[in-house]
């Protein structure tokens, strides 16, 4: 798997894990982060590459730090 794909997959797994821990649906997290649910789905599946604004919105909506979202993600 190319390095970029691994990075996106790991980030997506982190988002999904924190979302599950928070008891949020994709719909609710997307609403809280002000992004489209299908975009969030793509992030969680590792097929979308979110920009810094989206990463910050997700972190805020999940009540975690950007560092926590990026844990284990190696560029």
Regions from the PLM with identified roles:
Residues 53-68:
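DNA major-groove recognition helix of helix-turn-helix/homeodomain DNA-binding modules
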Residues 1-10:
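A detector for short, charged/polar N-terminal pre-domain segments
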Residues 15, 29-30, 40-43, 69:
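Conserved hydrophobic/aromatic packing and binding residues within compact polymer-binding modules
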Residues 2, 60, 71-75:
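Short, charged recognition helix plus adjacent turn
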Residues 34-48:
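Recognition helix of helix-turn-helix/homeodomain-like DNA-binding domains
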Residues 13-32:
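Short basic helix-loop element that most often maps to the first helix and adjoining turn
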Residues 9, 20-21, 49:
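Short amphipathic helical patch at the helix-1/turn junction of helix-turn-helix
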């Amino acid at each position: 798997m190319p390095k970029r794909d691994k990075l996106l997959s790991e980030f997506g797994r982190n988002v999904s894990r924190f979302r599950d821990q928070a008891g949020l649906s994709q719909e609710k997290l997307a609403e809280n982060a002000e992004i489209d649910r299908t975009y969030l789905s793509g992030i969680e599946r590792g097929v979308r590459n979110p920009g810094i604004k989206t990463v910050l919105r997700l972190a805020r909506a999940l009540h975690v730090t950007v560092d926590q979202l990026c844990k284990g993600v190696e560029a």
